[in-house]
């Protein structure tokens, strides 16, 4: 689960981290009141969406007067902001963050996340702050300094000081920077975060260090321990189809292609998407129905898939384990009775009760296209989608 910048900064404040003063605003009037409360000029008006690249997209602007705050707030609120992370459709701006401006000398990057290759947390720092870290990694990877964090030891002060030294921070700020790094790790662990990021952490012209932008992503599996964080969820920042999928415990992420996928297991789902790409197609979604899906959930998965007008074909790729193939077949038949399936459906099943599942589908009379392998299924899905164009 993602949260907005102003929510992440409020968490940072509670942990004693140096964050500029600022207030969220949900309408123009609140934006003006926030600027007046700050009482210093200029102020920064920031659109709040769950994506990076806001500055380049015009979502972060400097205001030098109340009139400018009103104008900028009116321009941003109620509109969609498109960045390189959102895609062309953008995300709705329903709130702003009004923050006191900071005189910047240097910008740095700091983040803690999970290194899946080592199954351990990792801290990344860079003197190339203010830029998108993906861009830095692609063009200047040596600019990113990383250190694996041993879970049984944690991030110690001497580790953090060494990282601050490598960043080239002034000696009088090494302890303060180290404290920021260790506190970030504390937040990462205590709040079950999957990523904590500061971009940028800035050295100000008066010789201080301040957090200018904050990002926290939380592990959904740990949210039951943090009801106060669950309340921060903003459903406007994800696709309505993703909101609907959550109601049925389906893992769904909308993509830009036209071949819908219905798969059990995240690994197989990603392999299926890769195979569709290799076959010349574009996946319309990631959809993991899980191992315990029943006929009702599968029917609801169909409804969600078919709600996407871009879908021209559906590729169902199931390896029957906990989710038996006959249960999948039952779900497909149930879905066909409840919704109008007006695009080609390609089915590839293997595993538990596969023969029974295939028999049920054959006897249903549904116009399904069958495949024996994932590659064959992907090729047939691409061919079927192209015919629908």
Swiss-Prot record:
GO molecular function: ATP binding; magnesium ion binding; succinate-CoA ligase (ADP-forming) activity; succinate-CoA ligase (GDP-forming) activity
UniProt entry keywords in alphabetical sequence: ATP-binding, Ligase, Magnesium, Metal-binding, Nucleotide-binding, Tricarboxylic acid cycle
Binding site for ATP: 46, 53-55, 99, 102, 107
GO cellular component terms given for this protein: cytosol; succinate-CoA ligase complex
ATP-grasp domain ranges (all copies): 9-244
Cofactor note: Binds 1 Mg(2+) ion per subunit.
One of the GO BP terms on file: tricarboxylic acid cycle
Enzymatic reactions: succinate + ATP + CoA = succinyl-CoA + ADP + phosphate; GTP + succinate + CoA = succinyl-CoA + GDP + phosphate
Residues that hold Mg(2+) according to the record: 199, 213
Family of this protein: Belongs to the succinate/malate CoA ligase beta subunit family.
Function: Succinyl-CoA synthetase functions in the citric acid cycle (TCA), coupling the hydrolysis of succinyl-CoA to the synthesis of either ATP or GTP and thus represents the only step of substrate-level phosphorylation in the TCA. The beta subunit provides nucleotide specificity of the enzyme and binds the substrate succinate, while the binding sites for coenzyme A and phosphate are found in the alpha subunit.
Subunit structure: Heterotetramer of two alpha and two beta subunits.
Protein name: Succinate--CoA ligase [ADP-forming] subunit beta
Organism: Sulfurihydrogenibium sp. (strain YO3AOP1)
Lineage: Bacteria, Pseudomonadati, Aquificota, Aquificia, Aquificales
């Amino acid at each position: 689960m993602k949260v907005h910048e102003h929510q992440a900064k409020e968490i940072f404040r509670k942990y004693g981290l140096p964050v500029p003063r600022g207030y969220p605003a949900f309408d123009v009037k609140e934006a003006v009141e926030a600027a007046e409360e700050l009482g210093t000029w200029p102020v920064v008006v920031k659109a709040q969406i769950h994506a990076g690249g806001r500055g380049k997209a015009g979502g972060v602007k400097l205001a030098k007067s109340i009139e400018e705050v009103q104008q900028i707030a009116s321009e941003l609120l109620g509109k969609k902001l498109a960045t390189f992370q959102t895609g062309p459709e953008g995300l709705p701006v329903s709130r702003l963050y009004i923050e006191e401006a900071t005189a910047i000398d240097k910008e740095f990057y700091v983040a803690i996340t999970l290194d899946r290759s080592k199954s351990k947390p990792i801290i990344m720092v860079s003197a190339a702050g203010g830029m998108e870290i993906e861009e830095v990694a692609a063009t200047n990877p040596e600019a990113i300094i990383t250190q694996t964090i041993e879970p049984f030891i944690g991030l110690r002060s001497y580790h953090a000081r060494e990282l601050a030294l490598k960043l080239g921070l002034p000696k009088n700020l090494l302890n303060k920077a180290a404290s920021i790094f260790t506190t970030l790790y504390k937040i990462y662990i205590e709040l079950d975060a999957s990523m904590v990021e500061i971009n940028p952490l800035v050295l100000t012209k008066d010789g201080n260090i301040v957090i200018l932008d904050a990002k926290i992503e939380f592990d959904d599996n740990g949210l039951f321990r943090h009801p106060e964080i669950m309340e921060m969820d903003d459903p406007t920042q994800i696709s309505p189809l993703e909101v609907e999928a959550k109601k049925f415990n389906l893992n769904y992420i909308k993509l830009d292609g036209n071949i819908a996928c219905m798969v059990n297991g995240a690994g197989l789902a990603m392999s299926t998407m890769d195979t569709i790409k290799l076959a010349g197609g574009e996946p319309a979604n990631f959809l993991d129905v899980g191992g315990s899906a029943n006929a009702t959930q599968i029917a609801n998965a169909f409804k969600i898939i078919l709600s996407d007008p871009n879908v021209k074909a559906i590729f169902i790729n199931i390896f029957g384990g906990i989710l038996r193939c006959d249960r999948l077949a039952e779900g497909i038949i149930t879905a066909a009775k409840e919704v109008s399936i007006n695009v080609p459906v390609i089915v590839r099943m293997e595993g538990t009760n596969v023969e029974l599942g295939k028999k049920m589908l054959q006897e249903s009379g549904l116009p399904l296209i069958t495949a024996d392998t994932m590659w064959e299924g992907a090729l047939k899905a691409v061919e079927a989608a192209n015919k629908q164009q």
